[in-house]
Amino acid sequence: MIEDPYLGKYVTCVSARSTDKEILKKAQDGGIATALMVYALEEGFIDGTIVAGEGDKPWQPKPEVAMTREEILKARGTRYSISPQISWLKEATRSFGLDKVGVTGVCCQMQAVRKAQLYPINMRDVPGKVAFTVGLFCMENFPYKSLQSIVEDHANQSLGSVKKMEITKGKFWVYTERGNVATVPLKATHKYEQPGCHVCLDYVSNLADISTGSVGSPDGWSTVFIRTKVGNEIWSKAVADGMFETKPIEEVKPGLDLLRKLAKEKIEKNQKTVEERKTFGVNKGLRNPYA
């Protein structure tokens, strides 16, 4: 087991992409999260998974329980807005009758899952049914109205015309169905961030079974951390079955140096906010869960 102060504990780390062309068509990068949940479902590791599906408005995520390949594929791609995934844990087990639940989410949501497993207050047997978690790299997230302001007021694009968004190279990128590409400097988006993101001390979803994101890998590929016994079992079997193409992370650019740099920046910046808030009398609620 490798331990890194900024990247957490992990068994191994690789650069990878799905070999499924259908998944890659609308995947954010290497299609890792989607492909993993499809594979886990088809191989019986999970009965279904909680995903960020399509809401009632353009690019508004909505938590859903996906129980088929098609339902998982509908949730492909990143939606840069808040989706309360964990609120659906009870729904997944009680209304849908799932005994082995998959959960995909960002860092704070992985932390919530692990807290529920340690302290299952008002959850009864639900946490024991979480079978597999895939965590996403996350620097910050935006309320829906904030996302709308970034796209429409700063990028000057209609949210309904957008086919993809991404955050990379210091900019918020917006791609439209007609081929337009607009960018917004990240310094202009900071005021729109969810305030809770400013006390988050995790960038790479340390507490997930497997965590993934684009940073560190070439375009069209994703960086993948295998973190737990469950994650290693599913990943090893999936790779052996030809579900992923992989490269050693040491052989790709920009590699872990950039990922570690960004993780360090987030943690150190947010730790300052945590220390400041301690003076407000809320120190007990801001204990570092990774310490």
Swiss-Prot record:
Keywords: Iron, Iron-sulfur, Metal-binding, Oxidoreductase. Its EC number is 1.12.98.1. It is an enzyme of class 1 (oxidoreductase). It comes from Methanosarcina barkeri (strain Fusaro / DSM 804). This is Coenzyme F420 hydrogenase subunit beta. InterPro entries: Co_F420_Hydgase/DH_bsu_N (IPR007516), FRHB/FDHB/HCAR-like (IPR045220), FrhB_archaea (IPR017679), FrhB_FdhB_C (IPR007525). Belongs to the FrhB family. Its cofactor is Ni(2+); iron-sulfur cluster; FAD. One of its GO terms (molecular function) is oxidoreductase activity, acting on CH or CH2 groups, with an iron-sulfur protein as acceptor. Reduces the physiological low-potential two-electron acceptor coenzyme F420, and the artificial one-electron acceptor methylviologen. PANTHER family: 7-HYDROXYMETHYL CHLOROPHYLL A REDUCTASE, CHLOROPLASTIC, FORMATE DEHYDROGENASE SUBUNIT BETA. Pfam families: FrhB_FdhB_C, FrhB_FdhB_N. It catalyses: oxidized coenzyme F420-(gamma-L-Glu)(n) + H2 + H(+) = reduced coenzyme F420-(gamma-L-Glu)(n). Pentamer of two alpha chains, two beta chains and a gamma chain. Gene3D superfamilies: 3.10.450.750.
